[in-house]
UniProtKB/Swiss-Prot annotation:
Subcellular localization, as worded in the UniProt entry: Cytoplasm
An example Gene Ontology CC term for this record: cytoplasm
Official protein name in the record: UvrABC system protein B
Primary localization: cytoplasm
Organism encoding this protein: Methanococcus maripaludis (strain DSM 14266 / JCM 13030 / NBRC 101832 / S2 / LL)
Record family assignment: Belongs to the UvrB family.
Keywords: ATP-binding, Cytoplasm, DNA damage, DNA excision, DNA repair, Excision nuclease, Nucleotide-binding, SOS response
Length: 646
């Protein structure tokens, strides 16, 4: 598999702790090419992604970067794309816009059918990722934990593809047959990824994993020319000699395998039915035979993934193929925010199995449905030959299983970890109001973390009554609206943002001059030492920022968090003095508006009348500009707000 080398493009060079971190990580990867496990302990804002990009360039290994949610995966994907414009950087997350898994609730005798809405763009990006890693080595795939779920056999995916070559003797009808075999659909009217059309001696195909049209021109029974067209204007982009056509879907099954799978399903059904009572037995038999009929007639059925063990000829208990199987053996895994991602990977299998158990026990699924599952953590570990755990607060697993912990404490900007103060829990709200007033005078913002959603709402309402412009973030707000709220905070449309655990990873706002942690002495998940250090890190983008922990007593978590912050701050200060560096607040451009806010739950009641006035002006402006859809959307938002104050 020949491919270009990774070439890192950046306007800046490694600085601060980055040089030592890069050298340390590369050294272990070269010294232990088959068992390199390392932790990059990098403080917030130290440029951990840039460090990893440098490591990838130096070791030249195909790389899988795993993040614990789609938002972080998207951020990392965009950063790596900027660093490696000449190489393949791909994105692999769950392709469901909406997903309701199949389940059965025995207590209510309620069966819930699977309901899902697939995002075609993300499905295309997933196909692009797998076709890239099977074709070349200069590939970085940024993924969510979706990468440990079943994906189809990579060998079969590659084998069932075929090459189109200029000068090749082949009938047009044979090309069409091959395309249909690998899930391409003929449609002479509308051409989208995964479809093809035929006109005379010309075939236009859009591979499932790209946007450009591939035009194949025949001369009799020979391929005369192949070139790529821009689908927008049909202009010719470039001519090519050959093209390898991968399937349009990840799950492709040869006809012979389909027959064997059906026989295997029927055999399992016969063996399992005696274990069920009459009602459950009848239900399962009826459902399974209907599914088989659909597979024979159409090639698929609802919930076909539950029969994947039979189609892939796996033994009972064997894991399904997943994205990790598409990589070559020497690939590098980077686990971002590992203190969050590792526990998430650990928990996936158990959650899936408990849901399937009631479906199997009550005759809705065969026991082989258990084997349509994510990897167990023990199975995932087998892929971790070369792994870098990345976190400001690595967990016990990472620290216990690393050859070394490489620290990245010094920021390229010279910024120090913020000063941390402990203040009494009494009058914490009044103290926050005073601090917010000080920050407003300085043109800076405030972040407050509470322990519950209700407390966040009540505090936001109270702050609004005290003339503090405040909003809160909650788990019901989707990614785009969350981005918009953060954008408005940065623009100064309000001064104080209240949240729960949403204020930890991935919220980097340079304008924040004060972070207040309420009830810091309540030991638990949101107030353990790792969570406190992550929250303190939200203030590490501003040279003058400070953090206050409101506590009635000094817990072990507070002691550890404060001690670690002071240790880092001391090292950073010494480095700055030695190299005559003055810390500079990060200057980060504010992105253009993404979308109008349609979720109104985060707006305090006291602020609603003013928001309505602003929105009405925006609605009339949109209507005058003939943007009727936008005007309707704003009108609906105003209606929601008016209901809230009735």
């Amino acid at each position: 598999m020949s491919s270009p080398d990774f070439k890192l493009k950046a306007e800046f060079k490694p600085k601060g702790s980055q040089l030592e971190a890069i050298a340390g990580l590369v050294k272990d990867l070269e010294k232990n090419p088959e068992k390199s496990k390392q932790t990059l302990l990098g403080v917030t804002g130290s440029g951990k992604t840039f460090t990893i990009a440098n490591v990838i360039e130096k070791v030249q290994k195909p790389t899988l970067v795993i993040a614990h949610n789609k938002t972080l995966a998207a951020q990392l994907y965009n950063e790596f794309k900027e660093f490696f414009p000449e190489n393949r950087v791909e994105y692999f997350v769950s392709y469901y816009d909406y997903y309701q898994p199949e389940s059965y609730i025995p207590q209510k005798d309620q069966y819930i059918e699977k309901d899902a809405q697939i995002n075609p763009k993300i499905e295309q990006m997933r196909l692009r990722a797998t076709s890239a890693i099977l074709s070349r080595r200069d590939v970085i795939i940024v993924a969510s934990v979706s990468c440990i779920y079943g994906l189809g056999n990579p060998e079969l995916f590659k084998e069932m593809g075929f090459e189109l070559k200029v000068g090749e003797k082949i009938k047009r009808s044979d090309i069409i047959e091959k395309l249909v075999d690998i899930q391409y659909e003929r449609n002479d009217m509308e051409l989208v990824p995964g479809r093809f059309r035929v006109k005379g001696d010309t075939l236009d195909i859009i591979p499932g994993y790209q946007d450009d049209i591939l035009r194949v021109e025949m001369f009799g029974d020979e391929i005369d020319r192949i070139y790529e067209l821009d689908p927008k204007n049909m202009s010719k982009k470039h001519e090519i000699d050959s093209f390898y056509m991968y399937p349009a879907k990840h799950f492709v099954i040869p006809e012979e395998d389909k027959k064997n799978a059906i026989n295997s399903i029927l055999k399992e059904l016969d063996e399992w039915l005696p274990n069920l009572d009459m009602l459950k037995s009848h239900r399962l038999k009826q459902k399974t035979l209907y599914d088989i009929e659909m597979i024979e007639e159409t090639g698929s059925c609802k919930g076909i993934e539950n029969y994947s063990r039979h189609f892939e000829n796996r033994k009972e208990g064997e894991p399904a193929y997943c994205l990790l199987d598409y990589f070559p053996e020497d690939f590098l895994i980077v686990i971002d925010e590992s203190h969050q991602t590792i526990p998430q990977i650990r928990g996936m299998y158990k959650g899936d199995r408990s849901r399937k158990q009631s479906l199997i026990d009550y005759g809705f699924r065969l026991p082989s449905a258990y084997d349509n599952r994510p990897l167990k953590f023990e199975e995932f570990k087998k892929y971790m030959n070369n792994v870098i755990f990345v976190s400001a607060t690595p967990g016990e697993y990472e620290l216990d299983n690393s050859n070394q912990v490489v620290e990245q404490i010094i920021r390229p900007t010279g910024l120090l970890d913020p000063e941390v103060e402990i203040r009494p829990i009494e009058n914490q709200v009044e103290d926050i109001i005073k601090e917010t007033e000080k920050m407003v005078e300085k043109g800076e913002r405030v972040l407050i973390t509470t322990l519950t959603k209700r407390l966040a709402e009540e505090l936001t309402e109270y702050l609004a009554k005290r003339n503090v412009k405040a909003r809160y973030l909650h788990s019901d707000i989707d990614t785009i609206e969350r981005t918009e709220i953060i954008r408005n905070l940065r623009l100064g449309k309000f001064d104080c943002l209240v949240g729960i655990n949403l204020l930890r990873e991935g919220l980097d706002i340079p304008e924040v001059g004060f972070v207040g942690i309420l009830d810091a002495d309540k030991e638990g998940f949101l107030r353990n030492d790792k969570s406190l250090i992550q929250t303190i890190g939200r203030a590490a983008r501003n040279a003058n920022s400070k953090v206050v922990l409101y506590a009635g007593k000094m817990t072990d978590s507070i002691k550890k968090a404060v001690s670690e912050t002071e240790r880092r701050r001391k090292l950073q200060k010494e480095h700055n003095e030695k190299h005559n560096i003055t810390p500079q607040t990060i200057v980060k451009p504010i992105r253009e508006k993404v979308v109008d806010i349609s979720d109104v739950k985060h707006i305090p009641v006291a602020d609603i009348p003013n928001v309505i006035v602003e929105l009405e002006a925006e609605m009339y402006e949109a209507a005058e500009a003939l943007e009727f859809e936008k005007a309707i959307k704003i009108r609906d938002t105003i209606a929601k707000l008016k209901k809230k104050i009735k």
